[in-house]
Amino acid sequence: MLFRKKDESLAGISRAGLSKWYEVLSDRDKVRVRRYAEGAPENSAFDMLMHIARGAFGDENYDFAAEICSHAAGFADTEMLRYEINELAIDALFLSERWEEALELCRGGKDMYVSLKGSEHFPDLPKDLRFRNRTIDILVGYMKDYESANAALDEFFEIGIISEEDLRYRKNSLK
């Protein structure tokens, strides 16, 4: 039974077009991938990697989730998919306490949001914007940079991510 599951996972990885990627992984990472690949969609590399990253994230294996997100980003063929993987990577990096990397992805997430906002995908964008929330979490909680946090809130207001009322509330909470 154990070997059949392993073989099924490997076949799924192959069907998703990830054989070469999988071959160069460390033995430890191969075990992790097979574990999280169980039940993953096999129709695309991106979908399988997202499934693996979400599984790792759900197990609080944040460093591995972030690593898988970086691989998945290479298979994201639309701006919406890049945005989706970026949001997951932000949380994985944040929870791994990799603040600077997370903040860099937050900046990219903001840019992607602005780009997507005017597209046909805009209604699909979630209300919970990880790039926005984690930007403030990092600037205030880790860097203690209240000035930059206020500037970020102003920018979020300018691009329509937060309302004027929300801007006042959030700025007041920084005091």
Set out the residue ranges of the language-model regions.
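Long, contiguous interaction/recruitment modules in multidomain scaffold/adaptor proteins
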Residues: 1-42, 64
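Helix-turn-helix repeat elements of alpha-solenoid scaffolds
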Residues: 18-30, 57-70, 98-115, 143-146
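Alpha-solenoid helical repeat scaffolds
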Residues: 82-87, 118-123, 133, 151, ...
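Acidic, low-complexity, intrinsically disordered interaction modules
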Residues: 116-120, 126, 138-142
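Terminal, low-structured helical/coil segments at or just beyond the last alpha-helical repeat
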Residues: 13, 145-175
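Amphipathic alpha-helical repeat scaffolds of TPR domains
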Residues: 41-54, 78-97, 104-111, 125-139
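Alpha-helical junction/boundary sensor with strong preference for TPR arrays
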Residues: 40, 69, 75-79, 106-120, ...
